[in-house]
């Protein structure tokens, strides 16, 4: 059974608790698996300061393929004549419902700000607006819990689906954001959705959203391009793109959620769409293991963390506001990258395509494995 690491000697409150209480940043767990629900591990994470859970098709694929905890339910569904893909959604929905129950006290005590768990629409719908809208609506109705986000990718086709779902009162986690331009579109979709609800006289207070801005993958891609750039200044720019871009995203967040337009919505009960820092594990072993936590601390944000990063942060992470302490420096880094021939918009497009493809492949591989398992059950 996985156990949360103890706090350092002499500590009375975990760093995760302090991160929220002192800095206003909510730490979430980037993993969901049925054994964690059954053996109490998720509850332990929550007691230690975790305030939400994220998952994606790769996480669900790893959870279902790597555990026998799903076998009995899957066998029962197949025996009922359910299609394999429909059986998958039943497995995933069951985990999300159970996780939402564990997190419900956090949701209630935070006034609906935290305590969320996410479930993503099928990855093959990432380039289909109408199908995404239909699938998101079905997931929302199927799970029917106030503290569940439906995840929609921030593709060009996903943007209008986000506005549509927000307008219908569905809380959305927008995922796979890799560029500032796309982030601007995500915020605009959220505001348009709220304005559509306001025009109908509908409640705005119950609609929540986070914008999942991916971090470490940006450095991985940019560092690779810097290695081949031939620019003599390139080595000094390695490992700087992701944090700089995320800090500029936070500035956009601050700008867009102030002013007359936002204040009109806020007066009707609307809540800000918080930036969620995703992909915050360190991919490059040369970088500190808490790099993408320590450097992005600030109020009204979320950081979703895999277990190893949680352990590292609890052991030696910092608790100092860092997201906007050097505002001019972030823009200067992107200027230097542009001078070195790095096109950040192209980086964003590349990573979006890779992210969509990776989730699609994970989902396809899982369905292949489940079909094989269903075939084995049919032979018994």
Show which residues each predicted segment covers.
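Hydrophobic faces of well-ordered beta-strands that scaffold small-molecule active sites
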Residues: 25-31, 51-55, 115-121, 148-152, ...
């Amino acid at each position: 059974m996985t156990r949360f690491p103890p706090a350092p000697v002499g500590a009375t409150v975990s760093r995760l608790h302090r991160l929220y209480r002192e800095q206003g940043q909510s730490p979430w767990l980037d993993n969901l698996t049925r054994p964690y629900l059954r053996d109490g591990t998720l509850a332990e994470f929550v007691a230690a300061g975790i305030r939400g859970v994220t998952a994606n098709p790769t996480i669900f694929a790893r959870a279902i393929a790597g555990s026998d905890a799903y076998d009995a339910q899957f066998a029962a569904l197949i025996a009922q004549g359910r299609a394999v893909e429909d059986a998958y959604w039943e497995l995933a929905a069951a985990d999300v419902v159970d996780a939402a129950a564990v997190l419900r006290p956090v949701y209630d005590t935070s006034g609906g700000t935290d305590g969320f768990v996410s479930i993503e629409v099928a990855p093959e719908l990432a380039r289909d607006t109408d199908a995404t809208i239909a699938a998101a609506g079905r997931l929302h109705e199927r799970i029917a819990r106030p503290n569940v986000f439906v995840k929609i990718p921030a593709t060009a086709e996903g943007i209008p689906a986000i506005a549509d779902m927000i307008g219908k009162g569905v809380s959305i986690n927008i995922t796979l954001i890799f560029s500032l331009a796309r982030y601007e579109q995500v915020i605009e979709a959220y505001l348009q959705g709220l304005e559509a609800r306001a025009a109908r006289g509908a409640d705005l207070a119950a609609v929540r959203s986070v914008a999942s801005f991916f971090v470490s993958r940006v450095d991985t891609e940019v560092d690779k391009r810097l290695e081949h750039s031939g620019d003599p200044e390139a080595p000094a720019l390695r490992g700087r793109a992701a944090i700089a871009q995320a800090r500029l995203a936070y500035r956009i967040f601050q700008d867009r959620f102030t002013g007359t337009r936002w204040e009109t919505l806020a007066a009707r009960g609307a809540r800000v769409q918080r930036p969620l820092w995703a992909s915050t594990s360190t991919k490059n072993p040369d970088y500190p293991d808490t790099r993408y936590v320590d450097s992005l601390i600030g109020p009204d944000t979320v950081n979703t963390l895999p277990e190893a990063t949680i352990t590292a942060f609890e052991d030696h992470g910092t608790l100092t506001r860092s997201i906007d302490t050097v505002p001019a420096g972030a823009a200067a880094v992107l200027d230097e990258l542009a001078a070195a021939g790095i096109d950040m918009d192209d980086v964003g497009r590349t990573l979006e395509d890779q992210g969509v493809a990776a989730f699609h492949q994970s989902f396809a591989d899982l369905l292949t494995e489940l079909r094989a398992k269903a075939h084995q059950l049919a032979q018994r």
